[in-house]
């Protein structure tokens, strides 16, 4: 004799409502985007400053020359690096690096050595001299338009106000890394535990 399973006393619309509630109770996927220099990493020992049109700027030629493996490995971590590591280990998160650096294997090795390997690295191409804020907006904007990332909450950490301003229309929350590193605290709503 074949027995039929008992009929559910729950209506289809009620079951659909339960599925909807369960899906909406799931934590929303977050994308944490970190700049590197003066955000997560202190590489100031490699920086040579110069005056250009009355403004103090980074000498990019000297920077490139000083970006040897030996010097990169002398960089140190800033307080925000601890939070980046927590984000990497957390569920429902992607961690991206978006840097104006031209990333070398030594840069990737440095991140790995400190447990800071992100899901994705966006970086400057070798001969690209696009202004940082334009470059970052372009790189991040292309990816956030892809379907898997459209509904994610985005949190961007950078030390330069010009970069934060450029990404205002793309990012849910722009956070000044310099201020966070100075006070050593992350806003409570992004605690990963």
Locate predicted features:
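Active-site-adjacent beta-strand anchor residues
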Residues: 10, 97-100, 157
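Acidic active-site catalytic centers that drive phospho-/nucleotidyl reactions
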Residues: 18, 35-37, 158-159
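C-terminal cap/substrate-recognition subdomain and adjoining C-terminal extension
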Residues: 27, 31, 102-193
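Short, small-residue-biased leader/transition segments that mark boundaries at the very start
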Residues: 4-20
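Alpha-helical substrate-recognition element adjacent to the catalytic core
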Residues: 27-130
């Amino acid at each position: 004799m074949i027995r039929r399973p008992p009929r559910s006393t729950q209506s289809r619309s009620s079951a659909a409502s339960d599925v909807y509630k369960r899906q909406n109770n799931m934590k929303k996927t977050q994308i944490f985007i970190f700049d590197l220099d003066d955000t997560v990493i202190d590489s100031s020992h490699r920086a040579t400053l110069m005056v250009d049109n009355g403004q103090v700027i980074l000498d990019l030629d000297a920077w490139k020359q000083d970006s040897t493996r030996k010097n990169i490995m002398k960089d140190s971590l800033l307080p925000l690096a601890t939070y980046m590591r927590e984000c990497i280990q957390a569920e429902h998160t992607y961690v991206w690096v978006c840097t104006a650096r031209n990333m070398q294997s030594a840069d990737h090795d440095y991140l790995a050595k400190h447990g800071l390997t992100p899901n994705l690295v966006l970086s400057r191409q070798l001969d690209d001299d696009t202004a940082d804020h334009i470059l970052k907006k372009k790189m991040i904007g292309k990816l956030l338009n892809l379907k898997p990332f459209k509904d994610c909450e985005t949190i961007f950490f950078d030390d330069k106000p010009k970069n934060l301003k450029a990404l205002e229309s793309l990012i849910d929350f722009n956070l000044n890394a310099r201020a966070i590193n100075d006070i050593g605290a992350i806003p409570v709503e992004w605690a990963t535990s």
